[in-house]
């Protein structure tokens, strides 16, 4: 055996140690923001690739099929970091002490609105009075704008949507939009960002639906991490997200997202209060 060969073999264990450390995947997850899982992966993978590269790890990205599932995965420590809706984050925080690192900005704003859309031919001058008895599709129970906030608002009006309407739930937001546009249901829950994205992508025409209700401004999606994540990794992820400026966001984030701002202790307080009010987390 040559001296060079012996030297290489002697160094091999030392070289393998950092390689193994760097080979631990960063387990990321994102909810069903786009019409299909493939669409969501294509839109959000560049952002998660940026995070993984920033912390020196390979990427393992999961696209969930519903909003509740992403909260469960984070709570069960199957995921390290997730881009998730506000209500999903609160569920994971309540169940397993998940922590929000940052709040996403959309067109420079950290807020959005829940909406209820209707078929454009329906005579709805007053909502919900004129819509009583109509069919309505809610999103799954892990959705902020598609489930929690509409349920909470109806509760403040003394209305149970399950008996006031012909009620169903469990749909994705894109599916809700298309169900209204094609006349499968009269009404559906959604959020303003999604409706705008569907129209911009040509999946929906603006004249195929009309908005009959809007919520107050809600905090945008969270970049959240699981409990007991290494503090150094958590700090590096936060810095990687907050370091994205508008120019970088245009390359690595979906259209119209412009970066992140730090999450504060009260960033999602209104979502947590709504969850308690409808009895979905403790203290309601």
Task: Report each predicted region and the residues it spans.
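Ligand-binding clefts/hinges and TM-proximal coupling segments of bilobed small-molecule sensing domains
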Residues: 138-153, 241-284
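Short helices/loops that flank or line small-molecule/ion binding pockets
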Residues: 68-82, 95, 129, 173-193
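Bilobed "Venus flytrap"/periplasmic-binding protein-like clamshell domains
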Residues: 25-54, 87, 110-177, 187, ...
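N-terminal export signals
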Residues: 7-21
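Periplasmic-binding protein-like
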Residues: 29-33, 106-115, 203-241, 255-274
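A ligand-binding cleft/hinge motif common to bilobed small-molecule-binding domains
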Residues: 86-96, 153-156, 181, 186-206
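Acidic, polar ligand-binding/catalytic clefts
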Residues: 71-130
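Short beta-strand-to-loop elements that line the ligand-binding cleft
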Residues: 59-65, 163-172, 210-213
């Amino acid at each position: 055996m040559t001296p060079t060969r012996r030297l290489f073999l002697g160094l091999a264990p030392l070289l393998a140690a950092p390689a193994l450390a760097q080979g631990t995947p960063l387990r990321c997850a994102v909810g069903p923001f786009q019409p299909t899982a493939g669409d969501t992966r294509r839109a959000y993978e560049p952002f998660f690739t940026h995070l993984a590269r920033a912390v020196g790890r390979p990427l393992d990205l999961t696209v969930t099929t519903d909003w509740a599932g992403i909260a469960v995965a984070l709570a069960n420590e199957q995921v390290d970091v997730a881009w998730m809706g506000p209500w999903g984050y609160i569920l994971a925080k309540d169940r397993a002490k998940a922590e929000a690192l940052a709040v996403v900005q959309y067109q420079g704003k950290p807020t959005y609105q829940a909406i209820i859309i209707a078929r454009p031919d329906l005579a709805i001058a007053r909502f919900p009075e004129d819509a009583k008895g109509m069919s309505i599709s809610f999103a799954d129970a892990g959705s902020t704008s598609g489930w929690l906030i509409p349920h909470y608002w109806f509760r403040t009006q003394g209305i149970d949507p399950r008996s006031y309407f012909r009620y169903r739930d469990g749909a994705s937001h894109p599916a809700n939009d298309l169900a209204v546009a094609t006349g499968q249901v009269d009404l559906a829950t959604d959020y303003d960002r999604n409706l705008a994205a569907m129209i911009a992508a040509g999946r929906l025409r603006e004249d195929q639906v009309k908005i009959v209700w809007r919520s107050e401004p809600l905090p945008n999606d969270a970049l959240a991490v699981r409990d007991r994540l290494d503090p150094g990794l958590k700090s590096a992820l936060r810095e990687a997200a907050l370091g994205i400026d508008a120019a970088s966001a245009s390359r690595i984030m979906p259209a119209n997202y412009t970066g992140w701002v730090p999450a504060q202790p009260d960033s999602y307080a209104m979502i947590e209060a709504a969850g308690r009010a409808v009895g979905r987390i403790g203290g309601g």
